[in-house]
Amino acid sequence: MNLRPEEIGSIIKQQIENYQVQVEVSSVGTVIQVGDGIARVYGLEDCMASELLEFPGGVLGMALNLEEDNVGCVILGPYTHIKEGDTVKRTGRVVSVPVGEALIGRVVNPLGQPLDGKGPIVTDKFRPVERIAPGVITRKSVHEPLQTGIKAIDSMIPIGRGQRELIIGDRQTGKTAIAIDTIINQKNTDVICIYVAIGQKASTVAKVVQTLKDHGAMDYTIVVSATASDPAPLLYLAPYAGCAMGEEFMEQGKHVLVVYDDLSKQAAAYRELSLLLRRPPGREAYPGDVFYLHSRLLERAAKLSDEYGGGSLTALPIIETQAGDVSAYIPTNVISITDGQIYLESDLFYAGVRPAVNVGLSVSRVGGAAQIKAMKQVAGSLRLDLAQYRELAAFAQFGSDLDKATLARLTRGERLVELLKQDQYKPMPVEEQVMAIFAAVNGYLDDLPVEKVRPFEAEFLKFMRANYPQIGEEIRTKGVLTDELTSRLKSAIEEFKKTFA
């Protein structure tokens, strides 16, 4: 082997000429204590609140407690390999998530990393998960309807775009079912949906995703999932991440629906973090700022004014109660933050009234302005009839002789309750809801046996679609029942009743 000194010399010269001194300065600290997903780090003097910190092995943490001599940090991933004395690096950025069209149809974790095995999410746009809610000037009052496709809700507890409507009830009362039905009903509208699953079983989330796929709803939906097996910090971050993804679309002038399922588990995760970080506990051991935890999230739902693009973000937070106790700490907090609540009762659920909406306790504080006029016309008497029915039903149990007017009200009420029942995953277009409720409140169902009410409704709507499609079309486009339209609808119902046996 021949050594050529001149060649070696030229290579060394070249290397020296190309050599660039690169000094990378990064602020580092040392782990002084770690355990239970929490690390205390010494030496990060310039650390920001909510800043991402990098632990050995690429695991990220988030600075939550900035104390005099150390930083209390929650670890967003596996922490068993982290030990005392490890070096922690500052990243200089706060927690942010990828946003944009690339996320639609995907299942991601609260950091925006894909969970569905469909490859990486290609987007160059990121948003911080926390941000200040839109101010008074940038907002507009809620005035457009967001149809859920559920008769009991669209008629009596209407939801508008930009509203925050709480869904509250015990476990197994159909809270998630209402949210999923609402998402399915946004098909063929311009609404982008985001379903945030917080602390649920992975199998439950998989089932929800499959249901959405089966109904073609994943084409306009993003699922953000922090399952029960994920670390508490991810459960805490999930709603904010979902909201940040929605805000990107809202600021482009689009309409977004975000479901937080459920915020009770987020509050429990935050309580866990706060206690581990040694923050002082308050009522029910929740930290003092648990109200702010939910208020700063739900205040980000808004209807933007036309100068800001006119987009909207509607929030449907879900809260699980224990044995119907709506006066517990978290339920009362969220009730006071939202613009109304849909209260689901287990007694109604077990009695076969599904969706199990308690119409007396449920309310929508702003949705009335968003309801279409035709629905307002038929639903006004519906609420009254049901209220009178509930009052009289209590007396009727005593079995005393009842006069004709009372009997008529009881008869009408029974049929209205029956009409408001609805199968899961079968949301109904608003014009069909109007026609069905119109028939009920005008007494066309009073002479039918209760068990015939649902078959009557199904056959009647089929008859209307086949023979009088223009009536439904007119209700949908004009949104009002004129005298002429009312008389046409009445004659159509009478014509159908003759054929219905």
Swiss-Prot record:
One Pfam family cited in the UniProt record for this chain: ATP-synt_ab
UniProt binding sites for ATP: G169, D170, R171, Q172, T173, G174, K175, T176
As one GO molecular function, the record gives:
proton-transporting ATP synthase activity, rotational mechanism
Cellular component GO terms, alphabetical:
plasma membrane; proton-transporting ATP synthase complex
Q: What is its EC number?
A: 7.1.2.2
Q: Where in the cell is it found?
A: Cell membrane
* Top EC class for this record: translocase
- Which of UniProt's keywords are assigned here? ATP synthesis, ATP-binding, Cell membrane, CF(1), Hydrogen ion transport, Ion transport, Membrane, Nucleotide-binding, Translocase, Transport
- Where's it mainly located? membrane
Q: Which reaction does it catalyse?
A: ATP + H2O + 4 H(+)(in) = ADP + phosphate + 5 H(+)(out)
Q: Which Gene3D superfamilies match?
A: 2.40.30.20, ATP synthase alpha/beta chain, C-terminal domain, P-loop containing nucleotide triphosphate hydrolases
Q: How does it sit in the bilayer?
A: Peripheral membrane protein
Q: Where is this site: Required for activity?
A: S362
Q: How does it assemble?
A: F-type ATPases have 2 components, CF(1) - the catalytic core - and CF(0) - the membrane proton channel. CF(1) has five subunits: alpha(3), beta(3), gamma(1), delta(1), epsilon(1). CF(0) has three main subunits: a(1), b(2) and c(9-12). The alpha and beta chains form an alternating ring which encloses part of the gamma chain. CF(1) is attached to CF(0) by a central stalk formed by the gamma and epsilon chains, while a peripheral stalk is formed by the delta and b chains.
What the entry lists under HAMAP family is as follows:
ATP_synth_alpha_bact
**Similarity field:** Belongs to the ATPase alpha/beta chains family.
General function of this protein: Produces ATP from ADP in the presence of a proton gradient across the membrane. The alpha chain is a regulatory subunit.
User: Which protein is depicted?
Assistant: ATP synthase subunit alpha
